[in-house]
């Protein structure tokens, strides 16, 4: 049976894709068959008439996953807006059945599957015939989660609010990862210390522009759960 994890964040442009790529890369470098999936992607580039799922393309390149990155994303939109708005603008009805079908198809190819969210944890995926929020996808696949947060000013507030929302939705959070971390920045140091001291969740860091995660592979493997 495959094992999975969901990567979400405290907001948009925090570094989910970057962290997701490094996690998958770390596992694949130890010969763990780890794949990638994303339900909806906005802000895709158009090349030669074809939309390119930029986030998936980045992950595939960094983690050395073979195949077409577009196959790892159910819905790809050009407009850089929330998925539900992109779907409206393109007259597309987002379906949970399609998301489930695509997810299980990819899951069957890998021993480990890393699912990346869109935006922050409170993200509308569809407001059409089906009303789908990001947390609905996490719940239907029974995935635990990693929360990616920026290491800088304001992260205590945004991280704790994100965790509170996830607690209300009964989503298990296995790890907090502070991105763009600077070991010499007093704010970053204090933020990590405060979160570590006040939460019952492990807090790790990822240095800015790092090529690898410093998290032990064993710790990453532990947080993936059977799905």
Curated annotation (Swiss-Prot):
The keyword ATP-binding applies. It catalyses: (7R,8S)-7,8-diammoniononanoate + CO2 + ATP = (4R,5S)-dethiobiotin + ADP + phosphate + 3 H(+). It is found in: Cytoplasm. The active site is at 38. Mg(2+) binds at residues 17, 55, 116. GO terms for cellular component: cytosol. ATP binds at residues 13-18, 55, 116-119, 179-180. Its main location: cytoplasm. Substrate binds at residue 42. GO terms for biological process: biotin biosynthetic process. It comes from the Bacteria. It is an enzyme of class 6 (ligase). NCBIfam families: bioD. Belongs to the dethiobiotin synthetase family. Homodimer. HAMAP family: BioD. Catalyzes a mechanistically unusual reaction, the ATP-dependent insertion of CO2 between the N7 and N8 nitrogen atoms of 7,8-diaminopelargonic acid (DAPA, also called 7,8-diammoniononanoate) to form a ureido ring. This is ATP-dependent dethiobiotin synthetase BioD. It comes from Clostridium botulinum (strain Hall / ATCC 3502 / NCTC 13319 / Type A). The gene is bioD.
């Amino acid at each position: 049976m495959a094992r999975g994890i969901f990567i979400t964040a405290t907001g948009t442009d925090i570094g989910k894709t970057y962290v997701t790529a490094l996690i998958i890369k770390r596992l694949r470098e130890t010969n763990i068959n780890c794949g990638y999936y994303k339900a909806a992607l906005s802000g895709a580039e158009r090349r030669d008439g074809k939309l390119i799922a930029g986030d998936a393309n980045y992950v595939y390149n960094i983690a050395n996953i073979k195949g077409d990155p577009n196959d790892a994303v159910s819905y790809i939109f050009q407009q850089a807006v929330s998925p539900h708005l992109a779907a409206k603008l393109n007259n597309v009805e987002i379906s949970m059945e399609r998301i489930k079908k695509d997810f299980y198809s990819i899951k069957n190819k890998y021993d480990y599957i890393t699912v990346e969210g869109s935006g922050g944890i409170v993200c509308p995926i569809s407001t059409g015939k089906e009303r789908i929020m990001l947390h609905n996808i996490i719940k239907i696949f029974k995935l635990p989660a990693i929360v990616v947060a920026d290491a800088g000013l304001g992260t205590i507030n945004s991280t704790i609010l994100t965790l509170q929302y996830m607690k209300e939705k009964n989503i298990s959070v296995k790890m907090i990862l502070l991105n763009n971390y600077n070991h010499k920045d007093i704010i970053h140091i204090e933020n990590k210390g405060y979160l570590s001291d006040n939460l019952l969740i492990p807090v790790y860091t990822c240095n800015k522009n790092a090529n690898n995660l410093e998290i032990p592979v064993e710790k990453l493997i532990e947080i993936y759960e059977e799905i």
